[in-house]
């Protein structure tokens, strides 16, 4: 018989929706450093029109912002070390 920890001793996790909101806020702050706020507002409005105020919409916005930031950094953003030659800070 395998030992299992008592269920009440598991680490507490924050609710999923709170985590999504926190991640989205962090991505928004970072995106505002690199992209035109009008573009981000238009993207947010587009997602809202398609999904409303839902976790599905928030998830899609997170995926889009992550990809946009990655591509931006990878293509040589001056604020990032990603995509730069070794030894260059």
Curated annotation (Swiss-Prot):
Alphabetical UniProt keywords: Activator, AIDS, Cell cycle, Host nucleus, Host-virus interaction, Phosphoprotein, Transcription, Transcription regulation, Viral penetration into host nucleus, Virion, Virus entry into host cell
GO cellular component, one term: host cell nucleus
Protein name as it appears in the record: Protein Vpr
Residues with PTM Phosphoserine: 80
Protein species of origin: Simian immunodeficiency virus (isolate F236/smH4) (SIV-sm)
Main location: virion
Covalent S-S links between cysteines: none
Keyword Cell cycle (UniProt): yes
UniProt subcellular location: Virion; Host nucleus
Subunit structure of this chain's protein: Interacts with human UNG.
Gene this chain is encoded by: vpr
């Amino acid at each position: 018989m395998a030992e299992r920890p008592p269920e009440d001793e598991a680490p507490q996790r924050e609710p999923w929706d709170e985590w999504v909101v926190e991640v989205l806020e962090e991505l928004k702050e970072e995106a505002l450093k690199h992209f035109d706020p009008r573009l981000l507002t238009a993207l947010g409005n587009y997602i809202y029109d398609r999904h409303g105020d839902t976790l599905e919409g928030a998830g899609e916005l997170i995926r889009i912002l992550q990809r946009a930031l990655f591509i931006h950094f990878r293509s040589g953003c001056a604020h990032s070390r990603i995509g730069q030659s070794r030894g260059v800070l």
